[in-house]
């Protein structure tokens, strides 16, 4: 029986490259001359910290990192950006966590979306991934198209496709 897994994974090497490109971009921008601004990528916490001297610059830096991540193939929905900008001393900072894996609540919504489509497939939650099995490849491809168009606020990848 054909099957595939729905996962949400992020390549940390690509994130690191995007952060380095964004840092390089900051050094060439005129509006960031003589300003203390930096990006910090924490691989263990899976987060990007944006720090600058004003909240407006933090917002600009967030746009820069989003653009660089998109160029590297990481969708904007992969970032979980904190709502408020933290201010301490003369610096403003913002944390953006990377969404890795599928949470149980999101997995339940995913399974419900698949079941509501009335396609002849079964979806099972297996840890941080969802396995979809069906009798025909066409049904599985229809599920893939459904998930790509469904707005669940997180990018999904399909792997382990078996025929």
UniProtKB/Swiss-Prot annotation:
The keyword Ligase does not apply. The keyword Nucleotide-binding applies. GO terms for cellular component: cytosol. CDD domains: YajQ_like (cd11740). Keywords: Nucleotide-binding. GO terms for molecular function: nucleotide binding. Nucleotide-binding protein. Belongs to the YajQ family. This is Nucleotide-binding protein HDEF_1968.
